Amino acid sequence: PRRGDAGRATVDGTIKASPDEQFWFGQFRMGLWPKFYDNSAFASQKDLNSFWRQMTPNTGPYNDKVIADAVTDALKKSEGTVLVTHSQGCGPGWLIGTEAGNNLKGIIAFEPGSGFIFPEGKVPAPIPNNSFFGPTKAVGVPLSEFKKLTRFPILIVYGDNIPKTEVKNPYQDYWRAASTMAQEFVKAVNAEGGHAKVLHLPDVGIKGNTH
């Protein structure tokens, strides 16, 4: 809801005309504008032009719960679904995992950057980084809700050009902090009896993937 093919919102929103391609080029780890990273698998400048054209703005305020409730209702019509999420959509994905019941058979989350949930009282401290977004934070939910994420396997996948230690590049350091929080999330799920894992594609020989 309020973005892309579900963009006809039922609440008001304002869309600002802002040229922000340089920012997203860096944030999506394609490279540092205007140069691609040397190992980038992104095809060409021509394809980049097409990529910018398919990006759509929010047409109303972003709301994890609204998104999660909508997808959860759709899942009730299925006989078993593996939920695939990406980027900001991974946050609602964890909430869907606590709401969807037995129809949800697994979650594959590609590059979550925010929206991680933890049991109340066990939320990690914010992770400082050099990005434009400030420290990477998580939120707490009741343990009874969090434990619902242990009913099915969870795989979190990250691409290339994410450093293991702090760097000055604000875009890369954002993802360093995000992937660190993902590791903490996986530990928390598994500590409650779950089956969660983080996969960094370069670690298995798959290189050059952007966000």
Q: Where are the model-predicted features located?
A:
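C-terminal catalytic histidine-bearing segment of alpha/beta-hydrolase fold enzymes
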Residues: 196-210
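Gly/Ala-rich beta-loop-alpha elbow adjacent to hydrolase catalytic centers
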Residues: 84-93
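Conserved acidic catalytic loop of the alpha/beta-hydrolase fold
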Residues: 61-82
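Cap/lid segment of the alpha/beta-hydrolase catalytic domain
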Residues: 2-62
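The feature captures the conserved acid-bearing segment of alpha/beta-hydrolase catalytic domains
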Residues: 112-192, 197
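Active-site signature of alpha/beta-hydrolase-fold catalytic machinery across serine-
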Residues: 95-99
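Accessory recognition modules or surfaces
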Residues: 1-27, 147-154, 161-162, 168, ...
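Conserved alpha/beta-hydrolase fold motif
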Residues: 83-84, 107
